[in-house]
Every structure is written in structure tokens, then in C-alpha cells.
């Protein structure tokens, strides 16, 4: 008997996105091996009947609405890399890499969230994702569609490449892009040193949430702030910059770093995004691909080994799969950077600039989310949509506190003009970048917070992280992006109250589920026959 569960699942207003969650999974089996003597030729009779392999039930993990596969005693996934790490920490040894775990171990490692530890919810598809992989169990309709597209054994896995999942959802008409797009607003910070700035930004988002306004920041963190001064020689910067050198200093004491890591974890757990701002904040406009690869390797080492390097206890709330985006220090890019971003697992880059009405395109395999070239409201000067550029324009990057209120007003009105033009125009995403610095007596932070409070609660406005924008963009075809760029959609402003209410979706409990031979870190290759001209 089907058990119906209800949960809140965020969809864009006016039914803009349709996801076929009202699906049930049909019976499936583990792969069976038939011995060679029973498969000699088609003309010979098989002299031994192979018993039908067992089927597995899909059981609720917790009260958040996700499932796992079980035979009543053992759990057959889904398992993430983070869960495997926890299992190993608990002394599980080789059992952590088995195709099945005890239900007790599985549920403990899964965590208390809707998605298994180490993954996050993609609100466009409704599936949890770990890096570039979506996590099942998947409904029979999608499994059948995958098989019909010659997906082979990959279709029976509980881990699909997200590109594959998007293509299947589109082909089966289970997901549909909105005719009128939301107005995305992206607010991000570069830096990560100041504990005061971490607390101030996080607390501001909480204050808005109490008012019914959703806002999530993206934090582009610099890895040197997670290396103590005494460990600085661990870093040998690319392009001959020298060992132990940094353009922005270091992380201070181990205690300083412990507190900073706590802020990173809290921000991530509160729904903000953590992304990469490289390591030493050097301008890489002349760096080779090898230089950038070296820099990214240092970033991973200093961030994900931060506790070990600095003699601390604890662990990050996410692993390398959680780092999906990049912004180059000083926006210094080179051809070598764009050749390596996709290879390093990044989904998007925010290091370029473009016109304010630009709809993102993929370049070199990653989404291009550029800052905007905009005109200031009071001084009518051209400036990038980033606080430092206002600071330089206003006072040549030197403090002038006596004019702080005027600078704040100019910045706020400029941001509002940027918003109004896009909101009433083609709704291209807004990109605004700030730093963990209170230049000109905090004028730019004040302007940013005033702006966020003014727009994030408006109808059809989504103040989200960059990875959430990437989730939305992954759903679109080039034709749909071109239509958005032209503004070829109804200019409808929804009612504010209807926009803020979550849509209630009914999900049917799957009776049985697919079980693959591999769990954990299995990686899948997208099925080429499913590309259908969609973006790579």
C-alpha cells in the first residue's frame, strides 16, 4: 500500500517549475551473476533454475521525507563520501566501503537532515546532490527512460551525474522552466578573516528571516586565513611568488583559526554557500594552467586539512564536493584559469564583468556569473558592482569618513537602479560583491544591507547563493536562455503574499527500490545520447 507523505518543497511562484515527484518505484534487484556453464549457447537448456534475487524496500530515513534501500536489516545506500569518512572515524574499517551497511550504522552516519551528510538539496529537481552527482533512489519512470536511452547498468545506480538527471527530467516532462524567470539577486563576500564580519552578515540574514525574508550569502574564502602564521612556509605560491608569502597576511593563531572554522561551519549549516577565493590573494592574470592547478591544490589542502595542520580538533561540515564556485583575487584571470576550472570540479566562475542585463552562459564548461558594469546614481560614473570599486571611485581607496553618508546613499541608489532596470526588464541575475572590510565608516555594508532588505522580500525575487543560481541555469536550454536574454516573456509581477508561501507537494512513498553493486564514491559518466543539444 502506498503511504502518502507531505512536505514543504520550495518552488518558484505561479507553478514556474514542475517536478514529477508523484512517482513510485517498481521492484528491482541486485545484479546477479550466472555461472558460465549455464550460458553456453542459446540452443542448450539451462539445467539449473537461478533463484530470483531479493527485492528491497524503500524506507524513510527520518521525518524529512527522504528514503533509503533496505532488506530489513541492511541498508544499501545512498551513501556519501562524508558518511564514509564518519564511518572510518568510528573505526568501521573496510566495512565502510561495502555495498551494504547495518541499518544502525547507516542511519547514524546519514545525519539528521533531509539529505545525507555531505550532500545538499537541489530545490529545482528535488534530489540531494553531492558535487556533480544526484543521489537516489530514483523513480522507475526515470530508470526506464535511462535504460531506453542505452544507459546500461548506470541506470540502476543510486548516483547519477546531475546533467543526466536534468536531461531525463526534461525529456520526461517532469521539470519545466518558468515562462517568466524569477529575479535572482546574488550577494557575496570575498575574504573570510574577520570574525566580526562573519557574525554581522550571518546575523543580518537571520534578522531578515525573522521578518519572512529569505537571504543567503555566498562566501568566497581565502585559504591563507586558515593557516597559522607559524605554518606559512607550507605555502609556496605559484609563479615564483615565494614560499611563505601572501598578499593579505595569514590566519593568526590556532585559536583564531578555530573560531574562523566555526564560523565557516555555522554559515554552511545555515544555508549559505562556501566558495573559493584561492589562497594568497595574488593576481593571476599571467598564470599558466599549471600555476592555477597548484593554487587550487593548496586551497584544498589548507581548507580541508585545516584542523590537522593547525593541531585542532573537529571537522568541516562539508567536503571538497561542497566547493562549487570560484572568484579570482583582484578579478585577475588568465587563459590558464579557464582551462582548469572545470577540471578542478568547479561549476561556475564569478571573475569576469559584463553588462547588467546579461543572462549567464557556459564558457569552458562552467557558468559565467559576471559582476556588472553599472552607472552610479549620484556621480554618473561607470563602476563594477563591487564595494571596493565604489570605495576607489568615491575616495581613491582612502578613508574619508566625513562623506560616508553620501557614499552610502550613492551606493544604495545605484544598487536599486540596477535592480529596478533588471526586475522590470529581462530579469537578468544581479551580481553584487563585497569584502570583509568596513571601508568609509561602513558605508558600503550599510548600503548592501539596506538594499537586501528593500528587494529580497519583493514578489518573484530570490536572494540566493550562486550554486542555487547554477541549479536553475542547469535546467535551461540555450533556446530558453536566449528568450530570457531578449526579455521574451510576460512582464508579470506576482502578488507578494503568494510569492512567500511555500508550495505544498505530495510525495508518494516508493514501495521498492533499485540497488546498485556500488555505493559511496561511485562516479558516473553522462550518457551522450541524452545530451539533445543541451548545455555541457
Protein language model regions, located:
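N-terminal secretory signal peptides that target proteins for export/translocation
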Residues: 1-11
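Short, low-complexity, disordered segments immediately C-terminal to signal peptides
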Residues: 32-50
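Extracellular/cell-surface secretome signature
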Residues: 52-160
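C-terminal motif of bacterial Sec signal peptides marking the signal peptidase cleavage site
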Residues: 26-27
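C-terminal domain-boundary segment and adjacent tail
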Residues: 159-168, 209-212, 218, 348-360, ...
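Active-site-adjacent pocket scaffolds in enzyme catalytic domains
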Residues: 238-247, 251-252, 312-426, 477-485, ...
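Conserved, mostly hydrophobic/aromatic
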Residues: 277, 341, 369, 432, ...
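Active-site beta->alpha N-cap acidic-glycine motif
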Residues: 159-273, 302, 306-339, 355-356, ...
Amino acid at each position: 500500500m502506498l503511504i502518502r507523505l507531505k512536505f514543504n518543497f520550495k518552488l518558484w511562484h505561479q507553478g514556474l517549475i514542475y517536478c514529477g515527484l508523484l512517482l513510485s518505484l517498481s521492484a528491482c534487484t541486485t545484479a546477479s551473476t550466472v555461472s558460465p556453464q549455464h550460458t553456453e549457447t542459446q540452443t542448450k537448456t539451462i539445467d539449473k533454475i537461478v533463484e530470483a534475487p531479493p527485492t528491497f524496500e524503500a524506507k524513510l530515513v527520518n521525518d524529512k521525507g527522504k528514503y533509503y534501500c533496505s532488506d530489513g536489516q541492511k541498508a544499501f545506500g545512498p551513501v556519501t563520501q562524508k558518511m564514509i569518512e564518519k564511518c572510518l572515524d568510528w573505526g568501521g574499517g573496510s566495512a565502510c566501503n561495502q555495498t551494504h551497511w547495518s541499518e544502525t550504522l547507516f542511519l547514524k552516519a546519514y545525519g539528521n537532515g533531509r539529505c545525507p551528510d555531505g550532500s545538499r538539496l537541489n530545490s529545482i529537481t528535488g534530489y540531494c546532490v553531492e558535487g556533480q552527482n544526484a543521489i537516489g533512489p530514483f523513480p522507475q519512470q526515470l530508470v526506464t527512460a535511462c535504460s531506453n536511452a542505452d544507459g546500461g547498468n548506470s541506470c540502476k545506480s543510486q548516483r547519477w551525474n546531475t546533467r543526466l538527471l536534468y536531461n531525463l527530467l526534461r525529456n520526461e516532462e517532469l521539470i519545466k522552466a518558468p515562462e517568466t524567470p524569477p529575479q535572482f539577486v546574488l550577494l557575496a563576500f570575498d575574504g573570510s578573516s574577520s570574525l566580526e564580519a562573519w557574525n554581522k552578515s550571518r546575523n543580518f540574514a537571520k534578522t531578515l528571516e525573522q521578518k519572512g525574508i529569505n537571504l543567503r550569502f555566498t562566501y568566497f574564502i581565502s585559504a591563507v586565513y586558515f593557516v597559522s602564521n607559524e605554518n606559512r612556509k607550507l605555502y609556496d605560491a605559484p609563479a615564483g611568488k615565494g614560499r611563505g608569502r601572501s598578499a593579505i597576511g595569514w590566519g593568526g593563531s590556532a585559536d583564531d583559526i578555530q573560531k574562523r572554522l566555526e564560523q565557516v561551519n555555522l554559515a554552511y549549516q545555515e544555508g549559505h554557500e562556501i566558495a573559493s577565493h584561492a589562497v594568497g590573494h595574488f593576481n593571476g592574470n599571467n598564470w599558466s594552467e599549471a600555476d592555477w592547478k597548484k593554487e587550487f591544490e593548496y586551497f584544498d589542502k589548507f581548507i580541508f586539512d585545516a584542523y590537522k595542520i593547525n593541531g585542532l580538533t573537529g571537522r568541516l561540515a562539508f567536503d571538497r564536493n561542497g566547493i562549487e564556485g570560484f572568484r579570482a583575487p583582484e578579478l585577475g584571470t588568465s587563459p590558464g584559469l579557464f582551462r582548469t576550472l572545470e577540471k578542478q570540479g568547479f561549476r561556475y566562475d564569478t571573475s569576469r564583468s559584463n553588462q547588467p542585463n546579461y543572462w549567464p552562459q557556459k564558457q569552458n564548461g562552467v557558468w559565467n556569473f559576471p559582476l556588472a558594469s553599472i552607472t552610479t546614481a549620484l556621480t554618473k560614473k561607470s563602476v563594477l558592482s563591487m564595494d571596493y570599486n565604489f570605495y576607489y571611485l568615491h575616495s581613491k581607496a582612502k578613508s574619508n569618513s566625513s562623506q560616508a553618508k553620501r557614499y552610502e546613499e550613492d551606493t544604495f541608489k545605484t544598487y536599486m537602479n540596477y535592480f529596478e532596470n533588471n526586475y522590470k526588464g529581462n530579469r537578468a541575475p544581479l551580481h553584487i560583491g563585497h569584502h570583509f572590510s568596513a571601508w568609509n565608516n561602513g558605508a558600503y555594508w550599510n548600503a548592501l544591507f539596506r538594499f537586501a532588505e528593500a528587494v529580497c522580500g519583493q514578489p518573484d525575487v530570490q536572494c540566493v547563493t550562486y550554486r542555487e543560481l547554477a541549479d536553475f541555469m542547469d535546467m535551461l536550454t540555450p533556446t530558453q536562455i536566449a528568450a530570457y536574454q531578449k526579455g521574451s516573456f510576460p512582464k508579470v509581477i506576482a502578488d507578494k503574499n503568494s510569492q512567500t508561501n511555500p508550495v505544498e507537494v505530495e510525495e508518494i512513498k516508493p514501495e521498492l527500490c533499485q540497488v546498485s553493486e556500488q555505493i559511496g564514491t561511485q562516479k558516473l559518466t553522462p550518457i551522450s545520447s541524452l545530451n539533445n543539444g543541451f548545455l555541457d
